[in-house]
Regions:
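Short coil/turn motifs at helix boundaries and re-entrant loops, enriched in small/polar
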Residues: 25, 35
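Alpha-helical scaffold domains
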Residues: 37-229
C-alpha cells in the first residue's frame, strides 16, 4: 500500500479487524493516505504502546523504500518527541523491519554517538543490539563509545547495560578485545551494582569464557546474541 499510513480519528470503542479499522481505546486507526507531514504531526504528540506497535507494523510492511526513508529521516528531527517516537517505533521492529534497517546501521551508530538525549540513546542502542555484527564491519569509534559508557558514572544503568552487551558483540571476533572487555568488567568487582547491570555483567563474562573456549578449540565463535537473551 503506497503512500499510506494510519489516519487517526474518534469512533468510540468500535470492534475492528486487522483488514480494516483497529481501535486503541476511543481512537481508531485505519489505513489511508498519510503524507510525511501528517506522520510528523502525529509523532510530535504523545503516543502509546499499542500505537507504537501499529506504526511499526505499517513502517515495516506498507512503506515503500521512499516512504521508509522519509520515516527514518524523522529520527533526526529537531523536535525531541518526534525523534524519540521514531526510535521507539523502530525498537519494536521484527525481523522484517530490522532487515530494512541493516543498511542504515552505521547511521544509527553515528546518531547514538551524537545525541545528548538519554532516552533516544537508550532506544538506539537497543535497536543496534538487535542488528547482526560482522567481523569486517566493526568500527573502532563505536566500540570505544560503548566502552566509555560502561565506565561512565554519568550514564544511566540501561545505557551501561546495553553498552556491555554491544561491546561483547563487537569484541567476540578478537581475543585481545575480549581480554580488554573482561578486564573492564572485572574492574567493577566489589562495587555495588544494580540487578540489571549485575545481570548484564554476569552474562557477558560467561559469554566471554565460552567464546574463549571456542577460540582455543580453533572454532569460530558461536556464542552470539541468543545466549544473552
Amino acid at each position: 500500500m503506497n503512500e499510506s499510513f494510519f489516519f487517526l480519528y474518534e469512533q468510540g470503542n468500535s470492534i475492528v479487524d486487522r483488514n480494516g479499522y483497529r481501535s486503541v481505546g476511543s481512537q481508531v486507526f485505519c489505513p489511508c493516505c498519510f503524507k510525511s507531514m501528517d506522520l510528523r504531526s502525529r509523532l510530535i504528540k504523545r503516543i502509546h504502546e499499542e500505537e507504537v506497535r501499529l506504526f511499526a507494523s505499517m513502517a515495516q510492511y506498507s512503506f515503500d523504500d521512499r516512504e521508509f526513508g522519509e520515516f527514518f529521516q524523522l529520527l533526526y528531527d529537531e523536535e525531541t518527541r518526534v525523534a524519540e517516537n521514531v526510535a521507539w517505533i523502530m525498537s519494536h521492529f521484527n525481523k522484517a523491519g530490522r532487515e530494512r534497517l541493516n543498511s542504515r546501521k552505521q547511521l544509527i551508530m553515528a546518531e547514538a554517538m551524537r545525541t545528548s538525549n538519554a532516552t533516544k540513546l537508550r532506544l538506539l542502542l537497543a535497536i543496534i543490539l538487535r542488528q547482526p555484527f560482522l567481523e569486517e564491519e566493526i568500527a573502532t569509534p563505536f566500540l570505544d563509545f560503548c566502552f566509555d559508557n560502561i565506565t561512565s558514572s554519568a550514564q544511566p544503568i540501561a545505557i551501561k547495560s546495553l553498552s556491555i552487551y554491544l561491546s561483547f558483540q563487537q569484541c567476540k571476533f578478537f581475543p585481545e578485545l575480549l581480554q580488554e572487555l573482561e578486564a573492564t568488567l572485572h574492574s567493577c568487582d566489589g562495587m555495588p551494582l544494580s540487578p540489571g547491570l549485575r545481570n548484564a555483567r554476569t552474562k557477558v563474562l560467561q559469554a566471554i569464557a565460552k567464546t574463549r573456549k571456542d577460540i582455543d578449540r580453533n572454532e569460530l565463535p558461536r556464542y552470539h546474541r541468543q545466549v544473552l537473551s
